[in-house]
Amino acid sequence: MVIGKGLISSVFSNYIDSEDILIFASGVSDSNETRISEFNRELELVRLSLSKYPTMLFVYFSTYSIDHICLNSRPYTKHKLNIENLIQENSSNYLICRLSNIVGAGGNSSN
């Protein structure tokens, strides 16, 4: 299963019908985001997905910024860490990928 409609989710289109793996690619993608409403939207969708599909491998795309001293105090980075903690507390079957610049130059307005 793939949740999301953007660039990352399109890469995993062959998992759309998977009953074992949930690719969560529907989250805050702009690292300059500060709106609480956007963070809450992702938080609630992660909660819903975890409760609705508890046995599936939950694949989440986080950010390398969590370990970067200059970036880990930003709202986006704190939000991603909060989501990671939520996943770890509510699933025993997950993969969290802390990726850097996934999209590349020109694919996201914050790059």
Predicted regions and their residues:
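Proline-centered loop/turn at the N-terminus of a beta-strand
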Residues: 56-57, 93
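Conserved catalytic-site region of short-chain dehydrogenase/reductase
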Residues: 60-70, 75, 102-106
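Canonical Rossmann dinucleotide-binding motif of NAD(H)/NADP(H)-dependent dehydrogenases/reductases
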Residues: 1-18
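Short active-site alpha-helical segment characteristic of glycosyltransferases
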Residues: 83
